[in-house]
Amino acid sequence: MATLFIADLHLQTEEPAIVAGFLRFLAVEARQADALYILGDLFEAWIGDDDPNPLHREMAVAIKSLVDSGVPCFFIHGNRDFLIGKRFARESGMILLPQEKVLDLYGRNVLIMHGDTLCTDDAGYQAFRAKVHNPWIQRLFLTLPLFIRRRIAARMRAGSKAANSSKSLDIMDVNAQTVVAEMEKHRVQWLVHGHTHRPAVHELSANDQPAFRVVLGAWHHEGSMVKVTPDNVELIAFPL
């Protein structure tokens, strides 16, 4: 019995080793799981379910194969792929979740999220996030021709990269008070998230009890997953 969590794969055709590693993961490790949760940024960018990128179809088929084998797959949007919609969910068999979700895992309540909403010290990013998550802005963007959406997405990624290069690492990490507030709001002692690309298990206090924040790593030179069993919560790095 085990439930698996991954995040921040940033899949793109320019990184075939990561794509191949994910396909192996779906065919091997994930097949033994009770469920797989993808906590955002599965793709490097997503400009709409109507994008004919062959990689998207390949990943949908692979995930659907996992689901058809009896392993449900759940997805929380990240800051790169927040426009993944019902069409891709239907094609892949994934179940879309809200940005925050509490799971009962073998008697242990665990809060899961992508993690970008925890980085409240980065006021610039949070303001940008509020704009792009505005439903009417998203609807307007999705009505644009694909070639225009690609240009906008490329400019946004370039702008984000330039902005992050001038920010301190602390600003781009989670805010400790925000973490505790979220855990106490949901009354949990465990939090699993991605986004920061800083894999670690942090001990803290929430609800006047010991608590733990488990951060998934990004898939760059190695894969990263959290494995929850009835007896343990493990952060595991593995070769791609």
From Swiss-Prot:
Cellular compartment(s): Cell inner membrane
Residues annotated for substrate binding in this entry: N79, R80, D122, S160, N164, K167, H195
Cofactors, names only: Mn(2+)
Entry's Gene Ontology cellular component terms: cytoplasm; extrinsic component of plasma membrane
Pathway: Glycolipid biosynthesis; lipid IV(A) biosynthesis; lipid IV(A) from (3R)-3-hydroxytetradecanoyl-[acyl-carrier-protein] and UDP-N-acetyl-alpha-D-glucosamine: step 4/6
A molecular function GO annotation: UDP-2,3-diacylglucosamine hydrolase activity
Annotated positions binding Mn(2+) 2: D41, N79, H114, H195
Topology versus the membrane: Peripheral membrane protein
Cofactor note text: Binds 2 Mn(2+) ions per subunit in a binuclear metal center.
Keyword DNA repair: no
EC number(s) reported in the record: 3.6.1.54
Biological process according to GO: lipid A biosynthetic process
Annotated positions binding Mn(2+) 1: D8, H10, D41, H197
Catalytically driven reaction(s): UDP-2-N,3-O-bis[(3R)-3-hydroxytetradecanoyl]-alpha-D-glucosamine + H2O = 2-N,3-O-bis[(3R)-3-hydroxytetradecanoyl]-alpha-D-glucosaminyl 1-phosphate + UMP + 2 H(+)
Enzyme class, UniProt record, top EC level: hydrolase
Signal peptide: none
UniProt keyword list: Cell inner membrane, Cell membrane, Hydrolase, Lipid A biosynthesis, Lipid biosynthesis, Lipid metabolism, Manganese, Membrane, Metal-binding
Recorded family membership: Belongs to the LpxH family.
Function: Hydrolyzes the pyrophosphate bond of UDP-2,3-diacylglucosamine to yield 2,3-diacylglucosamine 1-phosphate (lipid X) and UMP by catalyzing the attack of water at the alpha-P atom. Involved in the biosynthesis of lipid A, a phosphorylated glycolipid that anchors the lipopolysaccharide to the outer membrane of the cell.
Protein name: UDP-2,3-diacylglucosamine hydrolase
Organism listed in the record: Salmonella schwarzengrund (strain CVM19633)
